[in-house]
From Swiss-Prot:
The lineage of its organism: Eukaryota, Metazoa, Chordata, Craniata, Vertebrata. The keyword Ribonucleoprotein does not apply. Keywords: Cytoplasm, Cytoskeleton, Developmental protein, Differentiation, Kelch repeat, Phosphoprotein, Repeat, Spermatogenesis. This is Calicin. Residues 133-235 form the BACK domain.
Length: 588
């Protein structure tokens, strides 16, 4: 009789014991030296995982009693990395982070271990985001990681307006010529306008003038001078005096300026590259007259006072929420004829005009507030049913492809007004909840720290309004809450609220701001509003109609301006500020 017995996890058991022997310096027959640090190991183990070690053993005709010594340059691999590599060779486990991925890639290259290289490649793909895509592109080019290179390049191209801004330019000025030239040549480059592209080129050349001046002539040809403003052309002309062989470029600039003097002034928009960005307000979903739900996606182009239809949502809903993050718009929740609180979530790609289904929200929500902070999308509060509010704050985790509970507000609310400060803090200001059995807006400010998942500051203050307020920051610590009846200035440092004499005028149709309106701050103290319900002039009839107009409030002078009429009158649509590529104008 014969019986076969197999030990479970025997290979792992053997390697674990070999690793213990290595750390105790037992039975070793090779050593790696890095900057006075000596690491002992077993030749057979390393030869099995590293073609480098196997080659050294075979090429030197080593005998079983011989010992192998390898000296590693500490400028290439640190002692800590070599120790981590040895642990990986013996256990097959490795922890990769943004801090150690470059050295691990060097280690994979040095020891010629393809599997470790694959792990590093996968980590880079899963962890890439706006703030690190420039560094990841450098790594991808250095270690020939094509998929990472393509993703990182797309990340830089899609966020060029950030990298060329004062906030991002400190790192971007180190961009190598081959990458910088490729970006300027790209018709889909996301610049604010061609002015930014020309200014970025001049700043990049002057950052290392002696070595980069030779690239200026070639890269200058990638700029469409007809799309550049007179002010920036004059700036460029002055800068050219500091560069050699600039006469041809100066002549081109002078030619454009002279032509403009002789022609009728016209918009530069038609000359912009396809990827140039347009500040826009995007309206999604909503409810039409007679109760029909909408799936249309419309964009108001601020610069042109023009409405466009972008797309159609994959579902019809009102009281949903939306936020923009880079080239994407995220939408979730809402109500339909059949379901009062939807879990569904989608992502719209403004560049490709395409939709991607996302994992469902953990719970169905209406009147929740979606917001982007630090490049991450959050959903704040909301209702799961009439008069049933939640305090949950959800975060969409791009790596896990899941909605995760980020934390909770101090009290359950829907219809909250939210403003961000930096890349870390959400300020959740007022919201609707049940007070003594009645739906009422409460005066509360929660400062939610997205890193800790905690409300780090909660301030309550008396309010005399039940409509949706407008928010803005004055100086660094003063949060202004503007409404029709009263305005409040909250000192976040002293935790003190003071009434202000300024107030928000009623809409031109004499209605107050409400959760049914699409409301969007668009910078420079201006607020966009459209849709929502309006009460009939005869108060006795108590009839409600949907507001067909769009308005713009200039808070500096306290006046409303009526804008181009929206394509449809909508109640409770989602609304967000977005930067749309100029190529969408070609769809008109």
């Amino acid at each position: 009789m014969k019986l076969e017995f197999t030990e479970k996890n025997y290979n792992s058991f053997v390697l674990q014991n070999l690793n213990k022997q290595r750390k105790r310096k037992e039975y070793w027959d090779m050593a790696l030296t890095v900057d006075h640090h000596v690491f002992f190991a077993h030749r057979n183990v390393l030869a099995a995982v590293s073609p480098l070690v196997k080659s050294l053993v075979s090429s030197n005709d080593m005998k079983t009693t011989d010992e192998l010594y390898i000296t590693i340059d500490p400028n290439y691999l640190s002692p800590a990395t070599v120790d981590q590599l040895l642990d990986y060779f013996y256990s097959g486990k490795v922890v990769i982070s943004e801090q150690n991925v470059e050295e691990l890639l060097r280690g994979a290259q040095y020891f010629n271990t393809p599997r470790l290289r694959i792990h590093c490649n996968d980590f880079l793909i899963k962890s890439i985001r706006r703030v690190n895509c420039l560094r990841y592109l450098f790594l991808a080019e250095l270690f020939e990681l094509k998929e990472v290179s393509d993703l990182a390049y797309s990340g830089i191209r899609d966020n060029f307006h950030f990298w060329a801004s004062p906030e991002g330019s400190m790192h971007f000025m180190r961009c190598p010529p081959v990458i910088f030239g490729r970006l300027l040549r790209d018709e889909n480059l996301h610049v604010l306008n061609e002015d930014q592209a020309l200014s970025a080129l001049i700043n990049w050349v002057y950052f290392r003038k002696e070595e980069r001046e030779k690239y200026f002539k070639k890269f200058f040809n990638y700029i469409n001078l007809n799309a550049v403003s007179n002010k920036t052309l004059m700036f460029a002309s002055n800068k050219l005096t500091g560069l050699e062989n600039n006469s041809a470029h100066a002549t081109l600039i002078e030619s454009v300026l002279m032509d403009r003097k002789q022609e009728r002034p016209c918009s530069l928009l038609s000359y912009q590259r396809k990827g140039a960005l347009l500040d826009s307000v995007v309206i999604l979903g909503g409810q039409k007259a007679h109760g029909k739900f909408n799936d249309g996606v419309f964009a108001y182009i601020i610069q042109e006072n023009l409405w466009l239809k972008l797309s159609e949502m994959p579902y019809r809903a009102a009281a949903l929420s939306a936020t923009a993050a880079g080239r994407y718009i995220y939408i979730s929740g809402g109500t339909t004829e059949q379901i009062s609180g939807l879990k569904t979530a989608w992502r719209y790609d403004m560049d490709d005009n395409s939709w991607t289904k996302l994992p469902d929200l953990p719970i169905g929500l209406v009147f929740h507030t979606m917001v982007t902070c630090g490049g991450t999308v959050y959903s704040v509060g909301g209702s799961i049913a009439p008069r049933r509010y939640v305090s949950n704050i959800y975060r969409y985790d791009e790596r896990k492809e899941a909605w995760c509970l980020a934390g909770k507000m101090s009290i359950p609310m829907d219809g909250t007004a939210v403003i961000t400060k930096g890349d870390r803090n959400l300020y959740i200001v007022t919201g609707r909840c049940l007070v003594k059995g009645y739906i009422s807006r409460v005066g509360v400010v929660d400062c939610f720290d997205t890193c800790t998942g905690e409300v780090v500051q909660c301030i309550t203050f008396p309010i005399e309004f039940n409509h949706r307020p407008l928010l803005s920051f004055h100086q660094d610590n003063i949060l202004r809450v503007h409404s029709h009846r009263q305005s409040v200035e909250i000192n976040l440092q002293k935790i003190k609220a003071n009434k202000s004499t300024t107030s928000v005028p009623l809409l031109p149709n004499s209605c107050p701001l409400d959760v049914s309106h699409a409301i969007c701050s668009i910078g420079d103290s201006k607020v966009f509003v459209c849709g929502g319900v309006t009460t009939a002039s005869d108060v006795q009839t108590k009839d409600y109609t949907i507001n067909p107009n769009a308005y713009l409030l200039d808070q500096k002078i306290g006046e409303w301006k009526t804008l181009a009429c929206p394509p449809e009158a909508l109640d409770c649509p989602a609304c967000c500020l977005a930067k749309l590529p100029c190529k969408i104008l070609q769809r008109i």
